[in-house]
Amino acid sequence: MSKFGLKNTPQWQGLEKNYREIKKIHLRELFKDENRFNKFSIRDNDLGITFDYSKNIINSDTFKLLIEFVKAAKVTEYAKKMFSGEKINWTEKRAVLHTALRNRSNMPIYVNGKDVMPEIKAVLKKMENFSNDLRSGKWVGATGKKVTDVVNIGIGGSDLGPKMVCESLKYYADGPNVYFVSNIDGADIYEVLKKLNPGTTLFIVASKTFTTLETITNALTARKWLTDKLGDKAVANHFVALSTNVKKVKEFGIDENNMFEFWSFVGGRYSLWSAIGLPIACYVGFDKFIELLDGAYYIDQHFLNAPYEKNIPVIMAALGVWYNNFWGASSHAVLPYSQYLNKFPAYLQQGDMESNGKTINFEGRRVDYGTGPIIWGESGTNGQHSFYQLIHQGTKFIPCDFIGFVNPPEKIGDHHEKLMANYFAQTEALAFGLTKEEVAKNLKKAGISPADIKILTPHKIFEGNKPTNSILFDELTPRTLGALIALYEHKIFTQGIMWRINSFDQWGVELGKVLANVILPELKGQTDNKHDNSTKNLIKIFNSNKK
């Protein structure tokens, strides 16, 4: 990995100087430039997207410095390494090739000297055949009935990605109902199974190793539920596996012909493009799944080929670094103005926070600057009635992404116009706010007494100067959803390179798993291991109050 001392670079120092200057300037002042929107926005007619970043606290000098920072970090060089199969996840000695899963060209991609594209295409073909058979009724359960309900059992990337996509594309769904079970809490699977018929239910068990504690625990519960009603032989007709462990899959009772492979070069949080996306294909159809891949591939090419100054994920990343490292922003809100995208913020939480929640840099040293932000959000307008108060008038500095669509999949009265009126109003209010004079004038016009005006005015001031990006698609389709997901994937990648951290490992999830395995026997009355005073007493209370 190439090295450069981050805080000692002229780009970093230039941005520090620019911050000291621009923090004194309000967006009201910056918008006196009538050409500002044209300077700081991108329109792509082929995809049908407008990316407006003009409501960010930047000027031309800021933007130039941010682009120079990206260049100095050699983002394109690392991107080419990723796309070509080099092992950029060096702590696990793995290639990072989720982009190969949606490679729509005929270009070969090599890992350890082997072209992986034939295998990827073979799995896609297998997914197509299976999903078509399931949806048409050719695949039937043990009782000869068509499958009406699919239950995906997985966790992390084997759950969040396909669940988010199925929810986002619900309008297009014309296949079986799809449910997702992830939590080891028995309530999760109980609430799903109680409304299903074993004879018409198919389970998709998604676990690369087929040993993941939560997933296998839930899968065994599902198998018992099925076999209690239909017998052991029914497993072959009602379970398929997304895994690489043939031995464990066969031991479970699943025919290895019904096992869909994926690879170590695909990280869990980037895996929805792989066989992990099987529930998507079952739900909306394989053709729609391919459209999803097409949209992501379009952004892959944009990311690789567009100049930094016109590169949407690069600009998103650079602005995030600007606020994180120079303005002290510790969180970033993602606010989709579409109920279909209500699971998108939770999906991005894993994608971003598991990727860039790191403290160790390329050289194995602890960083002395902020890295990944806290990602959170809610679909509009629900969030307006809960946490927007804090964004507008609280003490935290929170950059926001507003995601919207010109044309909704459904058309019900003027619902969409009312939704989008709020979308546009919020970014305007956050940017420009209301001054003391404007508040007093409005109160006076409303007939409020001078005494009450004096009391109310400070509470009704909106400082504004809250930065936002507006990501506005012409419509929500499988293709534009794929593009949206890929935009954020490449934003996350770019920030990881700018911060000089590995965005593709996740060692922080391991310690808790190890300790849970130590504690589990204690909750079943076995050996009492040595713990701190707090943990020891909590376990004692748990055991003494069990029924």
UniProtKB/Swiss-Prot annotation:
| Family annotation (Gene3D superfamilies) | 1.10.1390.10, Glucose-6-phosphate isomerase like protein, domain 1
Recorded metabolic or biological pathway in which this protein acts: Carbohydrate biosynthesis; gluconeogenesis; Carbohydrate degradation; glycolysis; D-glyceraldehyde 3-phosphate and glycerone phosphate from D-glucose: step 2/4
On whether Cytoplasm is a keyword of this UniProt record, the answer is yes
This protein's source sits in the domain of life called Bacteria
Q: Which GO terms describe its biological process?
A: gluconeogenesis; glucose 6-phosphate metabolic process; glycolytic process
What sections of the sequence does the record tag as coiled-coil? none
Q: Does the keyword Cell membrane apply?
A: no
Q: What is its EC number?
A: 5.3.1.9
* Subcellular location field: Cytoplasm
Q: Where does it sit, as one GO cellular component term?
A: cytosol
Active site positions: 354 (proton donor), 385, 513
Catalysis: reaction(s): alpha-D-glucose 6-phosphate = beta-D-fructose 6-phosphate
What would you give as a GO molecular function for this chain, any one?
monosaccharide binding
Q: Which keywords, in A-to-Z order, does the entry hold?
A: Cytoplasm, Gluconeogenesis, Glycolysis, Isomerase
Q: Which InterPro entries match?
A: G6P_Isomerase, G6P_Isomerase_C, Phosphoglucose_isomerase_CS, SIS_dom_sf, SIS_PGI_1, SIS_PGI_2
**Which Pfam family is an annotated match for this chain, by its short name?**
PGI
Summary of the function given for this chain in its UniProt record: Catalyzes the reversible isomerization of glucose-6-phosphate to fructose-6-phosphate.
| HAMAP family, A to Z | G6P_isomerase
Q: Which NCBIfam families match?
A: PRK00179.1
Q: Which family does it belong to?
A: Belongs to the GPI family.
Protein name per UniProt: Glucose-6-phosphate isomerase
What is the organism lineage in this UniProt record?
A: Bacteria, Pseudomonadati, Elusimicrobiota, Endomicrobiia, Endomicrobiales
